[in-house]
Each structure stands twice: as structure tokens, then as C-alpha cells.
Amino acid sequence: IGLYLLSILTARDLGYIGTLEAVKRIGNTIGTMLRLEQWKGHYYNWYHTQTLEPLRPLYVSTVDNGNLIGYLITLSQGMEELFKRPLIGKENIAGLRDVLSLNSGEEDMEHQSLLNTLMDSETVSVSEWLMLLDDLKGQSKAVDQLITEYETEEELFFPWSRLLQKIPATLLSEKGVYQETSRKMSELLKQLNGPISLQNIYDNYLGILKSLSETMVSLNRDACQSSGFRESGKWLKDMEISLAGSYSAIRDFASRCHRLRSEIKDIIDKMD
């Protein structure tokens, strides 16, 4: 059980599954462990995989349970790290590259070259990541399955990410009435279009909203009579709504991870 739990973290580290899928699998396993019969907090060596009843002869190995404690401590620390690390990293690109290489029907030099280029870059922006996922769709069933996982967590945790692909040109213009608004917009994008973690959004939500609000104020003050005002205003309002959804989803996920880590600690503490 302990090795399986750590293999889930390893799969996430290698980019073969996403953060959401990793926590789901860990939660399912811990939930099953809590249902298993124990002896003074220790697990028996054998259980029926269907009924979960301990198999005879009943046997408790202090060595195996001791190893399990070590695995669970590592697991808990790894789960904390999942929340702090960027949701999109080079390991995700490496995982996609491996899956593409193993499942492509023919040598896919174009996509492999794109993946290698992103691997060599210093960071991967949210926009680059979304364009990559769109570009790789349809290559194979396995690739599409992994892309679906990544898109699911992107839509849950960063629902504003797709808005970054359709920013009104006027919000990025450095000329005329949009000059100050563009400067505020750049400050907002620096906080969103980079290697950001769930912890980053959770901790800096109010600061991000402040940057968004300043952009709105600048737009309303300086460009309310311009031709692109309505489109730009709608985009900013959509971003505000999406950020609220992002914060809510991340907060719920943080609570879920906290409960899981508490359950893991309880399992450890019960082993005398």
C-alpha cells in the first residue's frame, strides 16, 4: 500500500498524471485504509481485495508497519509540496513527450521538437501550455487522455486561463488613451501568465484582485469613450468572475488536502 501511494506521487513528478488525479487516487486509497480492520493501529499483512476482511492466519509485521509509517510521512510531505509547486512545470511537458513518443503511430518530429523547445525554455507560461495542449490533441488515445486530465484541472483551478488567449488588443496597446491601462494590465498578467502554483493564487488572491481593479479604474477613467471600451470592460469583468471561481476551487481543494493529511496523521498516530 505504501509503495503504491508513493508511486502516485512519482507519477505526478514525472508528468504522467495531474495534481487533481494524484490527490483523487491518494484519497481513494486512504479511504480504503480507514475501513480495514487493524490490531492496535497496526495493519494485518493480508486482506481480501473484495471484502477487505483480513485473511488468516492473522499476522502483523512490525517491520512492514514501520515501513508504512515512513511511506505515509513521505506521502504527507509530498502532498504539501503539490500545493506549493507550479501546477504547470517541465515535468508535465516531459510526461506528454514520453506518452507521445510511446503512442504515436509514426515518428512525430514536429511535436517532439516543440516539446523539446519548451523543455529547454526557462519557464512555461499558462498561454504556452494551453497552446501546446490544443496542438497535441488527436495524436493518440493515451495523449488525449492525459490532455483531458490537464485541461480538467486547468478549468477547475485556473478557469481564467483561456481568457489569456483572447485579450482585447486595446488592453495591450501602449498608445493613446490606453497607455496607463496597458501598464496596469501588464502588472496583472505578470501575476497570472507564468509558472504559478495553487498556493500562489490562494495567498495572493487579494493582490491579484487589486491589480485587476486598478486596470478597471484606469480603463473607465481614460478610455470610456474609445471604440474598444465595451469589449475591454467585458473581458476584465469575465476575468474577475473567473478569478473568484479559481479562488473558491483552490480553497476547497486545500481543505480536501488538509483533511487527507489529517487522516494520514491519524493512521500514523494509532500505531503504538
Tell what function each PLM region has.
Residues I1-D272:
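Acidic, mature catalytic/reactive cores of soluble proteins
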